[in-house]
């Protein structure tokens, strides 16, 4: 039902749909509805899922596991590519550290390493790294200044009503303000914000 709802939103608003594939047995259904397949951080090492993503014919967002090294992320991306899909987008969404006031630590040093050593698009997910709405704009601005290729930002018309990850959701006004603040940063480094 969720996939059909996403497909309706794509038709109504002309959006591309990215959704997470949690199990290889769901591959046919996800590929039928999604424009972009996402492999979540917890599933980064699931070879069956990576194989299904590699055979999907769709762009794949591969999220880095919170305990995974950069090389392990690259190796998993290479595995997807070995299955016939070179449309792999790497996603940094935070790693586990000794800090416990944020959900994860967004590894900006790792992003710089990936930019230097990998020829793949790199996006960041500050929503999951921070875990709270109040820091997402700052992280998004830092990521944009690094020249990354995209951001995953969680929004909800009523964040406190969200059924999952409510504390990290931006309301539409917060998202609009953040988006506006990213434009001059993107322009300053020769990027276009869409």
Across the structure, where does each feature detected by a protein language model lie?
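Alpha-helix N-cap and loop-to-helix initiation/capping positions
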Residues: 1, 41, 45, 68, ...
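N-terminal active-site wall of soluble small-molecule enzyme domains
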Residues: 1-34, 46-49
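Catalytic alpha/beta core domains of metabolic enzymes, predominantly
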Residues: 51-157
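C-terminal helical cap(s) of enzyme catalytic domains, especially alpha/beta-barrels
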Residues: 158-191
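Generic structural signal for well-ordered alpha-helices
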Residues: 3-7, 27, 50, 73-77, ...
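Structural motif
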Residues: 18-21, 40, 63, 127
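Short hydrophobic/aromatic-enriched beta-strand-loop microsegments
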Residues: 35-43, 60-61, 87-88
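Glycine-rich phosphate-binding active-site loops on the catalytic face of alpha/beta enzymes
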Residues: 41-45, 145-168
């Amino acid at each position: 039902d969720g996939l059909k709802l996403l497909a309706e939103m794509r038709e109504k608003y002309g959006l591309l749909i990215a959704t997470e594939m949690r199990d290889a047995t769901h591959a046919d259904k996800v590929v039928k509805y999604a424009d972009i397949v996402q492999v979540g951080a917890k599933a980064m090492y699931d070879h069956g899922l990576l194989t299904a993503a590699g055979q999907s014919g769709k762009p794949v967002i591969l999220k880095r596991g919170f305990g995974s090294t950069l090389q392990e992320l690259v190796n998993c991306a290479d595995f997807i590519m070995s299955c016939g899909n070179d449309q792999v987008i790497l996603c940094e969404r935070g790693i586990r550290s000794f800090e416990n006031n944020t959900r994860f630590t967004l590894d900006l040093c790792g992003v710089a390493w990936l930019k230097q050593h990998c020829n793949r698009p790199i996006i960041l997910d500050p929503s999951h790294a921070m875990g709270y709405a109040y820091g997402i704009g700052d992280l998004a601005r830092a990521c944009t200044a690094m020249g990354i290729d995209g951001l995953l930002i969680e929004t909800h018309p009523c964040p406190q009503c969200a059924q999952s990850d409510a504390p990290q959701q931006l309301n539409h006004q917060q998202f609009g303000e953040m988006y506006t603040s990213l434009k001059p940063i993107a322009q300053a480094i020769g990027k276009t914000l869409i």
